[in-house]
Curated annotation (Swiss-Prot):
Belongs to the NDK family. Keywords: ATP-binding, Cytoplasm, Kinase, Magnesium, Metal-binding, Nucleotide metabolism, Nucleotide-binding, Phosphoprotein, Transferase. This is Nucleoside diphosphate kinase. ATP binds at K11, F59, R87, T93, R104, N114. It holds the Pfam family NDK. The gene is ndk. GO terms for biological process: CTP biosynthetic process; GTP biosynthetic process; UTP biosynthetic process. The active site is at H117. InterPro entries: NDK-like_dom (IPR034907), NDK-like_dom_sf (IPR036850), Nucleoside_diP_kinase (IPR001564), Nucleoside_diP_kinase_AS (IPR023005). It catalyses: a 2'-deoxyribonucleoside 5'-diphosphate + ATP = a 2'-deoxyribonucleoside 5'-triphosphate + ADP; a ribonucleoside 5'-diphosphate + ATP = a ribonucleoside 5'-triphosphate + ADP. Homotetramer. Major role in the synthesis of nucleoside triphosphates other than ATP. The ATP gamma phosphate is transferred to the NDP beta phosphate via a ping-pong mechanism, using a phosphorylated active-site intermediate.
Length: 140
């Protein structure tokens, strides 16, 4: 087990329903420390760049439209095996298939409006953190 950093984004559906605190509680109860957090509304350009790996997929346009539909909360999380731990507490992408007690099962509304995004690998975590945060914004 190693200490890692990972990226998390609380999505517009959760923000609209005032679930930021609830999501943060799930993360912190799993032993993840929030070392950076900020709220913003992504531009279309930012969303397209962030989700560039999905550009050829049929859901790309609706994903960009959804993620820019309202504010998001961007986070850097730190903890032992943080990437795997965050993926576990988030639950399956589709809330209908997620385990009880996970963020997506308990808060998510649909496969798109599933309340949270999290890095799926070390490379993704590094890229996603660097995309949104300066080193000076990450407070240990």
């Amino acid at each position: 087990m190693t200490i890692q950093y990972t990226f998390s984004m609380i999505k517009p559906d959760a923000i609209k329903r005032n679930k930021i605190g609830q999501v943060n509680t799930y993360l912190e109860n799993e032993g993840l420390k929030i070392v950076a957090q900020k709220m913003t509304t992504l531009t279309k350009y930012e969303a397209e760049c962030f989700y560039d790996e999905h550009r050829a997929r049929p859901f790309f346009d609706s994903l960009v439209e959804y993620i820019t539909s309202g504010p998001v909360v961007l986070q850097v999380l730190k903890g032992m095996d943080a990437i795997t731990l965050n993926r576990k507490v988030m639950g399956a992408t589709n809330p209908a298939e997620a385990e009880a007690g996970t963020i997506r099962k308990d808060i998510g509304e649909s496969i798109e409006a599933n309340s949270i995004h999290g890095s799926d690998s070390e490379n993704s975590a590094k890229r996603e953190i660097k995309f949104f945060f300066k080193k000076s914004e990450i407070i240990e």
